[in-house]
UniProtKB/Swiss-Prot annotation:
Similarity-based family: Belongs to the CRT-like transporter family.
Protein origin, superkingdom: Eukaryota
Pfam family, one: CRT-like
Gene Ontology annotations of biological process type: amino acid transport
Record's GO cellular component terms: vacuolar membrane
Name of the protein described by the UniProt record: Putative chloroquine resistance transporter
């Protein structure tokens, strides 16, 4: 049995080695590339990309699906805020209730349809504090993001989202011991430079509904989001836990932990959303009437540059339900990608959603009143992000190759030890 197992591992490693031969010829053998024509290098480069996509077709199809869901989630989150941005607490808690019902129902169906042994083994493990920590971090992220989105325009929103990449890289390097290749840093640097150039151009434009303070609030949400992703990484890698169970329990905790973040609405310097506790019950009542009955309450002394946004509650429930649907799909796909692949894959996919969101704002049937006119700057930004992502992915491929070689050397050493022990016997 040992010989058969070693033979299978050797065959698998040989297959993986074939996958990286083209990469070696392009990256490692620099002198050979220098002697080839530019056309040959470009042809070889695209051949590597083709082989990469062929060998990971499932990953890329899943990534495209997740990308589409992410874009729709962010677009309808913004449309929901445009309709009832004065009632962020109401939309957040109502969304939590919907998620509780959906995830608990899905997990109940899973328990009934799965084998008893699988469910018994999983239910014996207690992840109480992990669930609480993830839910607390997610609740903080949702609340802070909702606050930031109230005065963050579509283009700025999509560009700020890309800052999650260096933030994730830093936290995973410091706390999870991730080690990156030079190409990972280069890819992230290209993306950051693209962001800097875009922000420089946009800073000369007049954007009345954009607020630097709220941009910074939205950026601060990345800290809690990164810690939440790290906790999920530890739970998925060290413990085998069902995705439905994770989301069902986390959203249940999140319904209560989000109440702990409630005092943020009472911070005086947040003038646009400042709401004393004495007005909380009135705000909740008006928010529910806006969501379910389409009644506008705040219609005077409101709008761009004013303390309050004007209510636009007609059809708010349709927009809100659509947002909840895509947000639930977003959570499930994100957990699945982290579970089956890695947080690196999740980071790469998250990178592309920025320019994708920007392009989505070109279409009125998606963006609604927040529709934007196409600009050359947006397409240059998309090119910069894609180029940085490709460089980032090449770094991952090189790291994967090193792991394969390390695993092959380890298997060869074990085979030699087994052979020596057999000869001695």
């Amino acid at each position: 049995m040992t010989g058969i197992k070693k033979g299978k591992n050797k065959k698998k490693n040989m297959k993986n080695d074939d996958r990286y031969k083209e990469l070696d010829s392009l990256i490692t053998n620099g002198s050979e590339i220098g002697n080839n024509s530019g056309r040959s290098c470009v042809k070889r480069f695209f051949k590597i990309i083709g082989n990469e996509m062929k060998n990971n077709v499932y990953v890329y199809l899943l990534s495209i699906l997740y990308l589409c869901v992410c874009v729709m989630n962010k677009v309808f989150a913004k449309r929901t805020l445009n309709k009832m941005g004065n009632y962020s607490f109401v939309t957040s808690e109502t969304h939590n209730i919907i998620c509780i019902i959906v995830f608990q129902l899905l997990y109940f169906i899973y328990r009934k349809t799965s084998s008893s042994s699988v469910y018994k083994n999983e239910s014996q493990k207690n992840f109480g504090w992990q669930f609480f920590l993830i839910s607390l971090l997610d609740a903080s992220t949702v609340i802070i993001s909702m606050i930031g989105l109230t005065r963050t325009t579509g283009n700025i929103q999509s560009f700020i989202m890309q800052l999650i990449i260096p933030v994730n890289m830093y936290f995973w390097f410091m706390f999870l011991g991730y080690r990156y290749h030079l190409f990972n840093y280069l890819g992230a640097f290209i993306i950051l430079i693209t962001i800097a150039v875009v922000e420089t151009f946009l800073s000369f434009e007049t954007q009345g509904e954009n607020s630097i303070i709220f941009n910074l609030i939205m950026i601060s949400a990345f800290n809690t989001l990164s810690f939440s992703n790290m906790t999920r990484e530890v739970v998925f890698k060290k413990h085998k836990i069902n995705i439905l169970r994770l989301n069902a329990m986390v959203v249940l905790f999140q319904f209560f932990t989000s109440l702990l973040v409630l005092p943020v609405y009472n911070i005086p310097f947040l003038k646009e959303i400042y709401m004393p506790f004495s007005e909380m019950s009135t705000n909740i009542n008006n928010g529910l009437r806006c969501l379910f009955y389409g009644e506008n309450t705040i219609v005077e002394n409101c709008g761009v540059g004013m303390v309050k946004m004007c209510d636009n509650c007609e059809g708010a429930w349709k927009t809100f339900i659509t947002f909840s649907f895509f947000n639930i799909c977003d959570n499930l796909l994100a957990c699945y990608i982290i579970d089956k692949f890695s947080t690196m894959t999740y980071t790469i996919v998250s990178c592309i959603q920025g320019p994708a969101i920007t392009i989505a704002y070109y279409f009125k049937f998606l963006a609604g009143d927040a529709v934007r006119k196409p600009r050359i700057l947006d397409f240059l930004t998309l090119f910069g992000y894609l180029f940085g992502t490709i460089i980032y992915r090449i770094g991952n491929i090189i790291l994967e190759k090193k792991q394969v070689i390390k695993s092959q050397n380890s298997n060869d050493s074990e085979a030699e030890l087994t052979s020596i022990e057999t000869s001695r016997a």
